[in-house]
Amino acid sequence: LIRDFIISNIKEVMTKYGFQYLETPSFEYTDSIGKFLPDKERPDQGVFSFKDENKWLSLRYDLTAPLARYVAKNYLEIPKPFKRYQLGTVWRNEKPGPGRFREFLQFDADYVGTKNLQADAELCVLISEILEKCGLDKTDYTVKVSSRKFTDKLFEQLKIKSKDQISTTLRALDKIDRLGWGEAKKLLGEGRKDKSGDYTKGANLKSDQIKIIENALKSKTPDSEDVLEIIKIFQAYNFKNYKFDPSVIRGLEYYTGPIFEVNLNFEVKNSKGQAIQFGSIGGGGRYDNLVSNFGNLDCPATGISIGLDRLVFALMQKKDFKIKSTRPVIICVFDKDKTKEYVNILNKLRASNISSEIYPGEGKLKKQMGYANKIGLIVKRKNSY
């Protein structure tokens, strides 16, 4: 019910903002999407794959790489800019946890074919509107903004040139919001063993390099032109629910400019009632070079996404969260010979657009009432009509 409520609000907002809906396939060739995964040197890591007639296929890891392939194939036919959104299942071959799933429904919104940073700013604004329509208050979340240009300068300062070391460092920094600086710091060094005993190899940075990163992440003032421009546009929209945060990295290598992350400001607990570091419920950024990987095209783009199942998990944590809904009706069966009368009542209810059903099983009133109670229906009692 909560998921349907969120989807309904997403569709309403996206229609208002003039986005078109686009569906992409669940499977992609592994060698096509592998280059966009967090570890492109090992494209089979993090995805579910199988071999089909000497070709490796993978369940999509996200909705962005499939979109890039679609745009490259249909570049001449689609309008530019192309404003697209999608709701679709994605799969991650990763360790699950509270609010983290191997299969989950994701929402994506993208602007393709424009370098104008108003597109980036508007994506943050529309995400904010969706979250508030779904029941979050302005104080419940923050849209954090940074830029990949910040990390580019940082890597120059660190004198890191190895692509493998750069990607490992990006993945480590991307985990700060979920693991905290102390644990992420281990991933910047030799590596980290989690509570289950699984070991993740680190970036093998030296202590002085890690110190440079730590100091850089304390910056409170943006110095990149793209972030400053986006903040100006936020002001034009009167959008105030944002914060510059250089620790927003995003682990995928295809980001080229501004990056965003949506974080919750209230405590989230696991099934044992323990407070956890939940991480973000969504994020995105500019990926100006991604489409060109599928064709010789200059096609800038930017996008943002929300993990719906993570949002559902978060909304369920709010004590004051309620969905206004009209409960359906069940008509209990007392006499099988009066089926015609029951159907007449059913038809009247459905003609008034009231969700209703005749009890579909067999059993006495107690059993029927138990069924109605378990599925939360209003019960139609004898002689009420």
Residue spans for each PLM region:
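Polyanion/phosphate-binding surface patch
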Residues: S26-L57, K185
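Short N-terminal amphipathic alpha-helices
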Residues: T15-T30, D44-G46, L59, I78-K83
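Positively charged, Gly/Ser-enriched RNA/tRNA-binding surfaces
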Residues: I2-Y17, E28-Y29, T64-L76, R84-D137, ...
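Short, glycine/charge-rich beta-strand/loop segments that flank catalytic centers
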Residues: T24-S32, F82-N93, Y141-T151
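Acidic, His- and aromatic-enriched active-site or binding-groove loops in soluble protein domains
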Residues: P43-N54, L158-A184, F239, V268
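Phosphate-rich ligand and nucleic-acid binding surfaces
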Residues: R148-K149, K153-I160
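Short, surface-exposed recognition loops or helix-turn segments adjacent to catalytic cores
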Residues: K138-K149, L170, K243-I249
